[in-house]
Amino acid sequence: MRQNSDYPSLGPFFFAGKIKLSIATESFSAMKRSRAESASGPQQPSRRQPQTSCDLCRSRKIKCDRGTPCGNCRTRGLACSIMSPSSAPSPGASSAESAGHGRLDTAILARLAALEQAVFRSTSAVGGSGNAENGAHGDATPRVPLSGLEREGRQTANFLDKAYDRCSSASTRSGYRPLDIRVAESCRDSFATGAPDPVWLMPQKDAVAMVHDFVENIYHLMPIVHIGSTVSVIDNVYPALQAGNINHVDPAQVALILGICAACAFFWDGGVPCQHRFETEGEATSASLIWKTSALYAFEEAQRRGSRSLEGAQACAILAYLTYNMDGPSTRFYRLHTCSVTACRELGIHLVDSRGCESTDSTARRELKRRLWWHVAATDWMLGLNGGPLDGTYTVHPRQARVALPRNLNDSDLAIDSEILTMPPHVPTQASCFLQVIRLAEICRMVVDSQSPDDSIADTAYNERVLASDELFKKAIESMPPPLVLTSPIPEGAPRFLCLQRASLHLGFHSRRARLLRPFLLYKDSDGRQGTTYRRSRELCVRSAQTVLEISTSLLEHSLRIRSPEPFRRQILHHPGHHSCPASPIHRLGVVVNHLFCACAILAFECSLRKNSSVHPRQQHRGAGGEDDLDGMLVHAYRLLAAAGEECTVAADLVCAMRGVFAKYRVDGDLATVDGRGGQNQIVGSSRSAMASVQTSAGGACNEQQQIGPAAWPGMRGAIPDENQPMGEGSLETGKAWDGFDKDLDDLFVANDTYCSWDQIFARLGSYCGP
């Protein structure tokens, strides 16, 4: 029908109103249809009485004894639960419809969780480039709740697995005498016998005091002990022992108590505030060795009994760390570390944040499990970029674990029952440096994954791959929170040992960075295109080694109270409050002395290569940081390493190893006469003598490296100059210190100017660099 021209044209408002009226009419019709359908449908009767039978008995129409759990569920190994009325399905609903709704709800929850993860992504300091792809973090992908069928299947599988474990892990109780565990009347009596059998525990009040010292003086970067839970263990162990119920005492808990006390005694010093005090450092050393041996005996007893407990895993990790600091990276250390990883897996700690984990642990205990797992995992990954027998390998695969990152909290904050409570990265806590250690470990794992045993340093692609890995270290160092920067002042309320913790953290970063770039030191600038291509890698390696040398020597000077010579005075750690930081345990930390040793080896090798070449790249900087300065720093570091050997067996052995490596490659020269007068200096004192004597009395056979005095070190006589002799005044011929190293340097190379591998030149160096 045509519109009459006499009428005005219909405007847009007319059509808009017509559309709105049509929509309203359709909506009203749909509303009437829905009301009619709901009225004609069957009405669902409400439940008159509360449900008394469990879900399993009700679904299978069997009699329920209404126990908790009931007999039917207990027989089948299933969880006994009663479905709430709000979640109960209607009687008229079909199974297909309920399954479809379940899948729809699961999909919606997954999409919502993924959206929240994308929008509110965590910006914690540990979130590096490899966190989102490795799948190890519990928050890497959303946790979707298990459906009823999935939960029943997992419970059945767990029941069958536990039945198998009970049959296959029978303890060997026959043929051995149970370990005798007693409580001494005084702390001195617990180690005065000098033998670990019977195992003597210190009095209860002393054990509680040392637990507080272990947690509050966290110089060891091991926040895997919670004061409240550990004190509860002590309160259970001591009354049982005093009542004579030794069969009711778990030896793993005894091992944890002894391991904590042994660590406190090993790092004890009278100048550090603590709740438990020894009379002398020699007494603390004796107690540490006896308690450590007793803890190992108790841990072996727990293994014979087939004990599985969180305390056993904690004890194994602490004993591994203590063994590393006492003996270095020995075979026992590697076995204890592997045992700690296995203990965590047996307890399911690697799945503490998985979908199927239905643990009833408290918030503090769950957080403790996260810290323990990340400690053993980080140690495992760092050993992969560490040298020694485990170099280039790791056993903890990130996709086989589901554990969230630890939160940035102090030990006292764990008492708050909250899973979301955490401090910002710029707030220093007892876990701040530990989180950065995890980040370092993840970088080490990615570096190991990017390399192959068949890689050749002559390949340019390998150099590019190494530089890409080095960029990970660089970004991690540059993005550290302000309190963890070396030159930053210590904030108010920071942990007591934050200064030492962050210095050890930077040692780990720069030492492994230097180790990554170390193979390219074999090329010189005069080696044509390859020498020019690898120049940046060599410069970064030397710079990182110098940083390690400066940090470690500054720490040892502060700990040993040795004044640095004026020409080599460094400012890298001279921040406000540096000298007020506790320093006593530093020279007993194997991390510091090991990294110092490897930095000295790298710089000595680089210095010798430059001396042997016709071009000296640092000739223009001879006045500040030139070769003469580097020679003096190396000699001073050598002196500090030997001085630390008075109380640290690892440091004393590393001095022997350094001279052994030099002698093996015919670098024996004037190094044995660093002192211009050629005089001898007995560097080993009474503390090392006490340690060796205690090891002998405890049943440990002392090897050649554990003898006392300069006689134990044939090449050490005269190697250490007089402490009263000033350096840099012409009396100490620093130029002769490393002249023997570049003697016969051409013998280090094979024909056709093809360098032998770095591992052949420094065959023994890698095994002495600790995690």
UniProtKB/Swiss-Prot annotation:
Residues 54-80 bind DNA. Residues 33-53, 125-150 are annotated as: Disordered. PANTHER family: CENTROMERE DNA-BINDING PROTEIN COMPLEX CBF3 SUBUNIT B, UNCHARACTERIZED TRANSCRIPTIONAL REGULATORY PROTEIN. This is Transcription factor TAS2. Keywords: DNA-binding, Metal-binding, Nucleus, Transcription, Transcription regulation, Virulence, Zinc. PROSITE patterns: ZN2_CY6_FUNGAL_1, ZN2_CY6_FUNGAL_2. Gene3D superfamilies: Zn(2)-C6 fungal-type DNA-binding domain (4.10.240.10). Its main location: nucleus. The keyword Transmembrane helix does not apply. The lineage of its organism: Eukaryota, Fungi, Dikarya, Ascomycota, Pezizomycotina. It comes from the Eukaryota. Induction: Expression is induced by the presence of dimethylsulphoxide (DMSO) or by the deletion of OSM1, a HOG1-related mitogen-activated protein kinase. Expression is positively regulated by the secondary metabolism regulator LAE1. Infection by the totivirus induces the transcription of TAS2. GO terms for biological process: DNA-templated transcription. It is found in: Nucleus. It comes from Pyricularia oryzae (strain 70-15 / ATCC MYA-4617 / FGSC 8958). Residues 42-51 have a biased composition (Low complexity). SUPFAM superfamilies: Zn2/Cys6 DNA-binding domain.
